[in-house]
Curated annotation (Swiss-Prot):
Membrane topology type: Multi-pass membrane protein
Location, primary (coarse class): membrane
Subcellular location: Cell membrane
S-S bonds: none
Domain of life: Bacteria
Keyword Transmembrane in record: yes
TM region positions: 13-30, 40-62, 67-89, 118-140, 147-169, 179-199, 253-271, 281-303, 334-356, 361-378, 385-402
One Gene Ontology cellular component: plasma membrane
Protein name: Uncharacterized protein aq_097
Amino acid sequence: MEILNRLTLTDYIVFTSFILYLLFFLSPFLERKRLWTVAVTPLASIIGSGYLVSAPLLYYVLGKYAILGMAGIVILAYLIGGAIRYNIIKAEPILYGSESSKLKALLLDVERFSNLSLAFAYMISIAFYLRLLSSFVFSGFFERNEVYERLLTTGLLLFIGISGFIRRLHFLEFMEKYAVGLKLSIIFSFLTALLYYNYKNFSFAGEVKPFDLHSLEVLGGILLIVQGFETSKYLGEEYTPEERVKSMKLAQWISGFIYVSFMFLITSVFVHNPPKKLDETEIIFLASAVSLVLGYLLRFGPLMSQFSAAVADTIGAGGLIYEETNHRVSSRFGYLITTLVGVALVWSANVFEIIAYASKAFAFYYLLQTIIAWLVSFEKKDRLQFLVFTLLIPVLIFIVLFGKSVE
């Protein structure tokens, strides 16, 4: 009864909106949509708990104009996604066609390097996501224990790998769909609460921060928070090129809306309650000040975020292995191989320290994919795409060399 007496109108708005969003995202209507099934994988990978840490970090760097930084990051990510989508439609027929040419030989070399870079990044990031999930579980419900946290991480990795090996892609998608449905319901109920908060307390009076080279380095690092859209490229064993392209677009539209809306709406909260720390726990603390119910939901949200992101990257890694071995190793074996490497990393390295290398590897992968798109667009005389890719390449070189890892 004491808790009920503490509930405010905002709490009831959060709870009601959460239930309504949950009914929608887990509805048979969405479940029957093939495009939604394909889009869930890149969406799960893009929206980890990164939106929680990117907001205070952007506000710290850009002040009240953080919304412009987030919009720029989302647009840049969409342009990079455009390079990968271009490769799915235009480069893959050259790469995997029967005709030989100098261009094909060059593209195969660049593609191989990019895939190796991505495989390296996936294997670290999957271990990182689940290791972080384990630390959330023990810090939130038990006492922290390094060995028990690694054991839980190992169990989760083996569960995902063995499930994917035995039940294949569609079972992983089934698990992912429910985790993403819960995660999106929490995120959209958070946005609803922030919308109500802004209705009562909107302010654009935050401080203005100087924009310099350090700001650009941090923005480059934050770009890697919205990575994950590339997983659509590696679903070719089950889905057509057109389906993969549409799924990536849909995932980037939804995630872009979430990231930009969240940054815009949370800015007023930061004006009244400046963030003291640059991590996801700070957002959870501030959300608890907005709504008691929201605070509890956000404590649960990161668990779903880390699990679904790990499943999504496992799917991507399995598809990558299938492609890189010229279809000799199926995706189901790829899932098992990926998670076993993850288990080895959990027990042999500190994944919280080596995640920075994964961030650089993701950036390098995007650079190489853009170079492939640049080469193909030049060959096919697609002038507009060639111009866009020409402008993207130096931006990605800067991010590879100078981007600050958010982790």
